[in-house]
Swiss-Prot record:
This is Meiotic sister-chromatid recombination protein 6, mitochondrial. It is found in: Mitochondrion. May be involved in the control of meiotic sister-chromatid recombination. Residues 1-15 form a transit peptide. GO terms for cellular component: mitochondrion. GO terms for biological process: DNA recombination; meiotic cell cycle.
Amino acid sequence: MLSVRISARQCSVRGLATQANNVSQPAKDNATNGSDAATEKKGTARYQRIQPSVALNSLKTKLSNDFQKQQPAQKIYSQFQSDLQQLISEQQVNPRHFVNSSICNSVLAKLILQSKSELDGQSIGESASIPPTPFEILETYLKYNLARHQHFIIVLKQFLIDLQPKEAINLWISFLEHAKQMPLNNTGTSQVQALTSIAYLMLSKESNSAPDVNVLTQLLNITPSKVPFLAIEQEIKSLGLTATTKDELLKSFDDLLLQWFTADKDAFINEFLKNSNDLKLITYLWKQYLKLATKDFTTSNQEIPGAFMIKLAQLDRSLDAVKIMTQLKEASADFKPSVSLYNSLLQTVAYIPAFGKEAQSIKLNRIQAIWNSYIKSSGNITVASYKAMLEALIIAGHFKTVESFWTLDVPDDVKANSEISDIYLKNFFASVKKVHFSQLKSKIPSKVHNLELANTILLAMVHSDASVGDIDSFYSHTFQSTEGIKPNDKTLAIKLRANLAAFGDSKNESILGTIGLSANSPTATLVIEEFLKICENEESATALLKALNIDNKSNDSAKKVSNFLDYYLQHGNWEYAEELFKKYLTDNVKSPSSVNYRLFNSMFKGFSELSITRNDTGFVSKQQVYWELCQRIHNRIFNECVISTLKSVSALSRRNAEFSENELDFINNTVLPYLVKLKIENSFKLQNPKYLQNMKSNDKIHIPKELL
């Protein structure tokens, strides 16, 4: 077993963490220096300027003391405002330096909650003064760059409980205006979006208008795939609304979902379902469709249930997918399977795994059983069914059977259908590996109108012994002629792969220039990502990295380098990935914050996957190195890095792995306390409770009570 425990041999990597002490921090903003640094009028004392973090810690301490004294909200709030003014006017603390701090998050949330409690009639302290409203307090936080997601959430909830949806919508607009000035918090943003969605449902009810997903997505400024549907239902149930209001909102939410499912089926299937990989969301939406859309699946051609079947199968839930047929029958006695649904079932069974020597035969038998029993027996086989059969055979890996089916079973008039012939040709060019170009040439159509097919042909040519001239000729004819197809990122990546073989070492040449891109083009990063997906070996990846000669100080360098980090870590070459990371850190020694979340996420995720696939706890020690470095550079750990670390520890704990004393110390005294801190700040929500459940199986790991 490979062990990667930190040792003297690897001290250069450990040095990444210790080196951070010597890395100069970002230059302090000089806006408050010079002419802005004021001295008091003649005869008064000069005030000493203090650091923003010191100022915020002072505010936090004062607020905490006021809460311990059980002072009323109005008194605490007034003193808080006075203290802020003093910091700004006398000690010259610029509020814009508060933007990225989380020091006061929890105590500021407590002030809003106390004002809410007092307004609800719960007397606190000795004063009977009228407390400030939560919104009034939030406005002050916004003024001084202290507002965070959790503060918006508290006020939004209060507006909804008070049945003030218009005020909630106005607050959402304010949130959008200030979101870029707050630390990144995807969990908090999702919750704010969910609460805003509830406000929209309330307004729809008030105006007697049917809720519409298109209107909601315009309001939230996101695509339907980003709407937090799960959170919306959970928030409706947990807000503490009256039973009547809650039931009305749940009914409106059901109407919203049904409208989304059925108003524009093509958009739901092609723009959302085919592009989403969120298994939890898709499973939830299927259950909702089954509950709400009886009329749709008993009167239509059932394209939506079929699309759910295929998507679940693609997400490795093929057994759940085939159960959909039974669920539909149980949901309504009026349900009768359509040919369209059987076409989807064909593709679904192709995803079901099979094992043993007869695995391929088993897969083929399943497909043929559906074809013969439900489609061929109907006597009228449509183009859609031939298409589904071809795709099912390709999914199952029966490339030779595709050839025989095409030759013996597909009628000539169907073969003439461009959609069908494109599928057949894609199968042919995708299945051939490193053959002579002469074997491909006769199959290449004179005109290609399908982008996916064109890319498949181009890649097959690159893998063959086709000359540079042959490849350039096909590329020019297919993509650069007046009637040509517009190339996508994958097209450019394949052409880049072809050009790389003939690329010289001249510093005057640019490898990206050979495909018409500049080094700083936004498309360049996407093309590099696609290149690494089609890259057949590490030598090609390294050749591209060398040819790119990435400037690690450029604006988009982190995106590019993180793609290579992902690639090398996925292929097990973590040593080279660390070399790239260390070089990036060295090149940015004067601005270490340039080593951003993308790079750290890549390292944490890569080590997480390696720890699991190799069952080696030593990679947790690697995560510790980057945890310490990230903390020193950014004063925080990015959420994805936290998740990757928890995933490692969870999987290894489930396998009864033995952690070293150093690793246990890291888990118990660094990772878990940090998770508690995030929970208190409401800046992170652990979506998979199994992580902690698995960790509990190790009696040397102590889960804090706050996380149980």
